[in-house]
């Protein structure tokens, strides 16, 4: 099973873009060359600000969604310190118990 990664890219105007991939360097190069997400095209110089392995695709999608819900301040803490990332992953891996 190929591991999936969550990554954040910083644009020239200091915005953070969140994505997932199985190959961070390849995906970053795609964004740099303008062949990645439309949201990053024409945004100037891009910098890979954060990346971390998250497990399988399902978990990566859930982690991406959760990170996209964070405030800019929380994302900056994640980039600077990895603050809360382990807890975020742990909360996504906790099995949900269905009640009848």
Swiss-Prot record:
Transmembrane segments: none annotated. InterPro entries: GIY-YIG_endonuc, GIY-YIG_endonuc_sf, UPF0213_domain, UPF0213_GIY-YIG_endonuc. It holds the Pfam family GIY-YIG. Gene3D superfamilies: GIY-YIG endonuclease. It comes from the Bacteria. Residues 2-77 form the GIY-YIG domain. Belongs to the UPF0213 family. PANTHER family: UPF0213 PROTEIN YHBQ (PTHR34477:SF1). This is UPF0213 protein YhbQ. The lineage of its organism: Bacteria, Pseudomonadati, Pseudomonadota, Gammaproteobacteria, Enterobacterales. The gene is yhbQ.
